[in-house]
Amino acid sequence: MTTIALFGAGGKMGYRLSTNFRGSPYTVRHVEVSEAGRERLKTGLGFDAVSADAALDGADIVILAVPDTHIGKVAADIESKLAPGTMVIVLDAAAPFAGHLPNRPDLTYFVTHPCHPPIFNDETDMAAKKDYFGGVMAKQHMVSALMQGPEADYAKGEAVAKIIWAPVMRSHRVTVEQMALLEPGLSETVCASLLVVMKEAVDEVVARGVDQQAALDFLLGHMNVLGAVIFGETKGVFSDACNKAIEFGKPVLMRDDWKRVFEPEEIAASIRRIT
């Protein structure tokens, strides 16, 4: 049976993984340094945390479910204990992209990240509809990259990732560089920033006298139908008035060179700021 050493097992992400690995075909050894995390594992899931040395002894796969800022240090601390052929799984592209993993050609590095439950979905169960992050009840897609290692290891890593992010719909294979374009580039630098602007726009119309709930209802409803048209979820076209508003509004809101956020140096700078 494949043995997994799960680092950060009692943390925010690690606890999700610890939960999802219950009943899986893997033997999981849980590593958690904080007392609160160890207690959470014990009382919530009935798991006892073990030392890093005990977890790594004979482990086939090591999952680093720790913050981006800690991955480099944790990886460096355990490198000497990793046997050739061990697979190291990281849950975000930032640290691998920034070069924070040890220079060990004899290890397999697999990077995976969730797409999170899509806005347009077929969920009917209320618990699934309220699972906005995913990995509990709501179905989601995922992306993965084999950064280094034998080609056969991709399927091995993908099988683990499908448990991590379960329930999974589509599984997309990308490179680490492409994953960095997706996050922080697409999802955070672009999408999150524009969503913050939308919230500020709601605040502005409220300050100008519109009822807050009315403003929220109006915006969120329009986001649904406008998004469905823009991304091809439904057949339809915008009104002439809407197209004219976009024509004149976009130059006011967006710099002409805004797409430079996807240039390699901009992606690298963004990742340096978070790692």
Report the location of each language-model feature.
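Amphipathic alpha-helical segments within well-ordered protein domains
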Residues: 199-206
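Rossmann-fold dinucleotide-binding core
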Residues: 91-183
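NAD(P)+-binding Rossmann beta1-loop-alpha1 motif at the extreme N-terminus of oxidoreductases
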Residues: 1-45
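NAD(P)-dependent Rossmann-like dehydrogenase/reductase catalytic/cofactor-binding core
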Residues: 138, 210-275
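Rossmann-fold NAD(P) dinucleotide-binding segment
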Residues: 56-100
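Short acidic low-complexity segments
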Residues: 45-59
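A short glycine-threonine-serine/GTX helix/turn-capping micro-motif
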Residues: 183-192
